[in-house]
């Protein structure tokens, strides 16, 4: 049970992308590849997930459903050590964690993110639910306390960025490919 405009977001290595403005997440690609009208026949995990987010916003979704198990790690997060090794000016990906609050503040888009390996999301979460033997428990207060004890320097990223209005072609939304669901034989 959820909103009727909720969209499941995942990485889809190898998918085709046609003229999607992924610049909110991806910039400064090699060979000056355009990210304001990004096109490829063979997207990486991070570019496909960025495109999936933007396409969901383009169709008016106000709720993104994300599971870290089906996400591109480098799209979702960059830890402090990696930020020190590869400085922002050399990294083309702005991770989702750095944009999720602005996405809500500027566009009213909420995100439900299932994570089991990244406590960094405690810093940006409004609510933290932990599954304890398949029973959901609100652990927001505990998570916020943990986050405050392990404070990190947040990098200012500015605004979320623009969402370009496009006309989606029906053929670009065909449900064929390696993720097509097949009914089992009975």
What are these language model-derived features?
Residues 56-100, 104-105, 117-142:
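Conserved P-loop NTPase nucleotide-binding/switch module
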Residues 37-40, 46, 63:
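C-terminal amphipathic alpha-helical segment
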Residues 44-57:
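Conserved alpha-helical scaffold flanking the Walker A/P-loop in AAA+ ATPase domains
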Residues 127-186:
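Conserved P-loop NTPase
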Residues 2-41, 77-78:
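P-loop NTPase switch/communication element
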Residues 110-113:
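Conserved H-loop
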Residues 40-44, 87-90, 107-108:
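Short, flexible loop segments at the rims of nucleotide/cofactor-binding pockets, characterized by
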Residues 4-6, 61, 170:
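Active-site lining segments that contact anionic ligands and/or coordinate catalytic metals
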């Amino acid at each position: 049970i959820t909103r009727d405009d909720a969209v499941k977001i995942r990485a889809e290595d190898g998918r085709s992308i046609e003229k999607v403005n992924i610049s909110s997440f991806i910039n400064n690609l090699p060979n000056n590849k355009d990210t304001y009208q990004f096109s490829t026949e063979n997207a990486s995990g991070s570019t496909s997930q960025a495109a999936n987010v933007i396409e969901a916003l383009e169709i008016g979704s106000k709720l993104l459903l994300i599971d870290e198990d089906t996400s591109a790690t480098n799209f979702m997060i960059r830890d402090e050590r990696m930020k020190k090794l590869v400085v922002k000016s050399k990294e083309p990906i702005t991770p989702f964690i750095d944009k999720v609050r602005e996405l809500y503040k500027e566009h009213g888009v909420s995100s439900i993110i299932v994570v089991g390996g990244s406590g960094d999301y405690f810093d940006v979460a409004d609510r933290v639910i932990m599954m304890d033997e398949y029973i959901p428990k609100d652990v927001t207060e505990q998570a916020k306390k943990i986050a405050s004890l392990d404070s990190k320097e947040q990098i200012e990223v500015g605004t979320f960025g623009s969402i370009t209005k496009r006309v989606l072609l029906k053929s670009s939304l065909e449900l064929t490919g390696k993720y097509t669901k097949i009914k089992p034989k009975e």
